[in-house]
């Protein structure tokens, strides 16, 4: 996107940007949506400071799309974000909105932004947040999406905001669990976030030295897993750590009987 500055100091998108043409704006908004991710506050700070460089005013939208509908706007400036870079969570809060997916909710959101003089919105969040942004973009609001999700499941993004911290936190937990697993010669299963994405399990499992990693993207065979664990113990292995993404478990290929709760009975403990 080609960015230039008018004589008045306001930032605008030059005609070189393509089919959108020249867009003049002097105020933008920023919101965080979805689950909070470590680094969101640093991203908010970066947006505010960069906007200040281009002499743009910044409005913070509290509680994501819920706040967009209910006009929960606050003014942001470099001073208001001076001490947030190392804080977890998000200073703009985050909340679910049952109203935004409706045409009425989206129309109200656009109306509130236009009434506030906002032409551009920066959305810091994950895939669901970006889908919401696409709806606003189709209504004429310029959108920039900043990938911020611990699942790291945004296409064409190497590392989303929050993913690295999450992996390091899981590795730290695995390192602590391993000592107990070795002492008692037991199997420990570590479940991590990732309903449809196995990035956390894969990276943390590799970095933490887990014996087995199960991810939603790869079909797992529970019987084969058990055979590998038993084989390891016969060879003298003192413990086994299995890292499992939360989305794994619905399609196990197994001949074992499942009880009424659908819980897998790996063996007597």
What kind of region is each of these model predictions?
Residues 33-36, 56, 61-67, 96-97, ...:
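Short, ordered loop/turn segments at secondary-structure junctions
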Residues 68-123, 128-129, 161-173:
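Glycine-rich oxoanion-binding loops at beta->alpha junctions
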Residues 27-34, 90-95, 119-123, 188-191, ...:
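Short glycine-rich or small-residue beta-strand-to-loop segments that form or flank ligand, phosphate
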Residues 112, 123-125, 131, 135, ...:
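Accessory alpha-helical/coil subdomains and C-terminal extensions
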Residues 25-69:
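N-terminal phosphate-binding or glycine-rich loops at protein starts, especially the Walker A/P-loop
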